[in-house]
Amino acid sequence: MQTKEAIRFALTISNRALLNVIDEMSGAATTFPTPQGGCHPLWVLGHLALVEGMIPAALLGEPNAAADWAPLFGENSEPVADPAAYPTFAEVRAKYVQMRERNLQLLDALSESDLDKPALAPPKGREQEFATYGRSFLVLALHQMIHRAHVTDARRAARVAA
């Protein structure tokens, strides 16, 4: 197996695992995973869309297509229970899917040796994680699975059957 194939596999499996549980929570998208709050499913999905937009920005210097969502879904934002504070679940999901598809197209256009290229503009404070094209794509899959745990905890809190 080549590195590119392994990265694509990780992106595909993590995406499937995430969207399955995200879709189960579409009717309870602002359910917090714990009584103390945390990252609810709508926030997770918007946050992941924002991170997907970091790939073209880091690798190609393009603007992040979800940058306007940073106040709602950025690393230092605080999830709130009011769904009216956010774009709709359908809008956030569509944006996430669109950006993931764009990133898969970018990955498909790369050669194996391209994966070792240094990222043009890695996010400030995340230079190590986004140091190369390959690492940048791999971070998406790993990051996605970290946040999937928040969604499964929210599902449990909402008592939505798996």
What do the predicted segments below correspond to?
Residues 1-5:
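N-terminal export signals and maturation junctions of secreted/periplasmic proteins
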Residues 24, 44-47, 109:
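Conserved catalytic core of Hanks-type protein kinase domains
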Residues 8-12, 19, 29-76, 118-162:
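Short, contiguous alpha-helical
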Residues 77-117, 135-140:
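Acidic/histidine-rich alpha-helical segments that form the ligand environment
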Residues 11, 15-18, 22, 55, ...:
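Hydrophobic alpha-helical core bundles mediating ligand binding, dimerization, or RNAP-core interactions
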